[in-house]
């Protein structure tokens, strides 16, 4: 068990996954709150909304019509953050002197970023979230993620054979497949979901985004560097493999687990009820999951989202995302990657009080009040049937 003294004193915790520190202040949980309160998401949505750009059969903003899909539907984002076609930019690489132009080139660096962005609906039903779906209903979402990831792998990728095996097991999407980027080999695929208006979601229809980029983004890049460093310094051991063993032995931050996945409030969590879903065996990417593990992963996602909603009996907002091996990588980068999923929810004390990353957190380092151990205990107590099913 964690030293009990840490439950009562301010202290810092280290995040070995990205090399950062955060401040924990458990004594502040009793402070009064007179600040901003969020409007809880209590409105009942229709199963079909004729004005929704994502519902089956509807027209999207740029004029294309969605098919009358039954489960998932993926398409190229009409407002992509990165594009394949754009004017070429060649950054200067020879700034080695002390002249004004050299200094400016050193300090004002830029690099082109290209790619392709997709939108993926989780369900045809406008009023359904992952928390409302069964594990078997979530599996097609995971299968679509897998197909899109596999279609973007480089020709020399260490996981090409695994991708071929995986695709042979997964049925094709009856509503069609998205075409991968063709102009160049992309470096990384970031799958993420912003759920709820509090997290900036612009459409309540259940969906996620998939951005494929020519560069390795900052967060997965830092994690990959840390995992590679750990692997080199500890005779081939894996950082998250060892972390899973530590958390399973201690138990106090474990929220839920099955044979394939561990759900924890990590030691280094920044957000009040932050959760990390980690593969128990060395899975480097979606394409290495077996059919049984895809179901186990779906169960883990269902458990997290359902417990979130049960915690404050509201449609719990969060941002979530998957980190896995890059689309184009070396043997070492593939070997040191470990499949995991982050959940970052903002709610702190109730359905109306959220955490803000401001002030000290922006100027110094992240800070939290409730400890990860306390958060895990509360989430463990929120299992069972989704609260709103008893209200129907």
UniProtKB/Swiss-Prot annotation:
Annotated catalysed reactions: alpha-D-galactose 1-phosphate + UDP-alpha-D-glucose = alpha-D-glucose 1-phosphate + UDP-alpha-D-galactose
Task: Name the GO cellular-component terms.
Answer: cytoplasm
Pfam families annotated for this entry?
GalP_UDP_tr_C, GalP_UDP_transf
PROSITE patterns in UniProt: GAL_P_UDP_TRANSF_I (PS00117)
Q: Which UniProt keywords apply?
A: Carbohydrate metabolism, Galactose metabolism, Iron, Metal-binding, Nucleotidyltransferase, Transferase, Zinc
Q: Name one GO biological process term.
A: galactose catabolic process via UDP-galactose, Leloir pathway
Which residues are named in the active-site annotation?
A: 207 (tele-ump-histidine intermediate)
Keyword Nucleotidyltransferase among record annotations: yes
Entry EC number(s):
2.7.7.12
Q: Which Gene3D superfamilies match?
A: HIT-like (3.30.428.10)
Q: Which GO MF terms are attached to this record?
A: UDP-glucose:hexose-1-phosphate uridylyltransferase activity; zinc ion binding
Where do the annotations place Zn(2+) binding? 52, 55, 126, 205
Q: Which cofactor does it need?
A: Zn(2+)
Q: Name the positions where UDP-alpha-D-glucose binds.
A: 61, 77-78, 194, 209, 355-358, 360-361
Question: According to its UniProt record, in which pathway does this protein act?
Answer: Carbohydrate metabolism; galactose metabolism
Co-factor remark: Binds 1 zinc ion per subunit. Zinc binding seems to play a structural role.
Where Fe cation binds, per the record, is at 223, 323, 340, 342
Q: How does it assemble?
A: Homodimer.
Its family remark reads: Belongs to the galactose-1-phosphate uridylyltransferase type 1 family.
Record-linked NCBIfam families: galT_1 (TIGR00209)
Protein name as annotated: Galactose-1-phosphate uridylyltransferase
Q: Which gene encodes it?
A: gal-7
């Amino acid at each position: 068990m964690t030293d009990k003294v840490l439950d009562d004193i301010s202290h810092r915790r280290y995040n070995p996954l990205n090399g950062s520190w955060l401040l924990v202040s458990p004594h502040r949980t009793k402070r009064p709150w007179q600040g901003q309160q969020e409007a809880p998401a209590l409105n009942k949505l229709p199963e079909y909304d004729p004005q929704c750009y994502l519902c089956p059969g509807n027209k999207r903003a740029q004029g294309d019509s969605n098919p009358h899909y039954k489960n998932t539907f993926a398409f190229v984002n009409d407002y992509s953050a990165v594009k394949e076609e754009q004017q070429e930019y060649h950054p200067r690489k020879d700034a080695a002197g002390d002249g004004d132009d050299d200094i400016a080139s050193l300090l004002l660096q830029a690099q082109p970023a290209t790619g392709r962005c997709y939108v993926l609906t989780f369900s045809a039903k406008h009023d359904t979230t992952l928390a409302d779906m069964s594990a078997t209903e979530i599996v097609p979402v995971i299968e679509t993620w897998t197909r899109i990831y596999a279609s973007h792998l480089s020709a020399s990728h260490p996981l090409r054979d695994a991708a071929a095996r995986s695709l042979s097991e997964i049925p094709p999407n009856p509503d069609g497949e998205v075409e991968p980027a063709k102009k160049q080999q992309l470096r990384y695929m970031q799958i993420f979901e912003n759920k709820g208006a509090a997290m900036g979601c612009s459409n309540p229809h259940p969906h996620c985004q998939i951005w494929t980029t020519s560069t390795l983004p900052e967060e997965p890049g830092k994690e990959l560097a840390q995992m590679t460093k750990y692997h080199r310094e500890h005779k081939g051991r894996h950082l998250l493999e060892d972390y899973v063993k530590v958390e399973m032995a201690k138990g106090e931050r474990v929220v839920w687990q099955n044979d394939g996945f561990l759900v924890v409030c990590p030691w280094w969590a920044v957000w009040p009820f932050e959760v990390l879903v980690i593969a128990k065996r060395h899975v480097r990417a979606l394409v290495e999951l077996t059919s049984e593990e895809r179901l186990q992963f779906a169960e883990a996602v269902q458990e997290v989202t359902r417990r979130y909603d049960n915690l404050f009996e509201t449609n719990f907002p969060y941002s979530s995302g998957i980190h896995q091996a890059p689309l184009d990588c070396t043997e070492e980068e593939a070997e040191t990657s470990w499949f995991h999923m982050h959940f970052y929810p903002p709610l702190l004390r109730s359905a109306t009080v959220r955490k803000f990353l401001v002030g000290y957190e922006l100027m110094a380092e992240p800070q939290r009040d409730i400890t990860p151990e306390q958060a895990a205990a509360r989430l463990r107590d929120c299992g069972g049937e989704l609260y709103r099913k008893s209200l129907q």
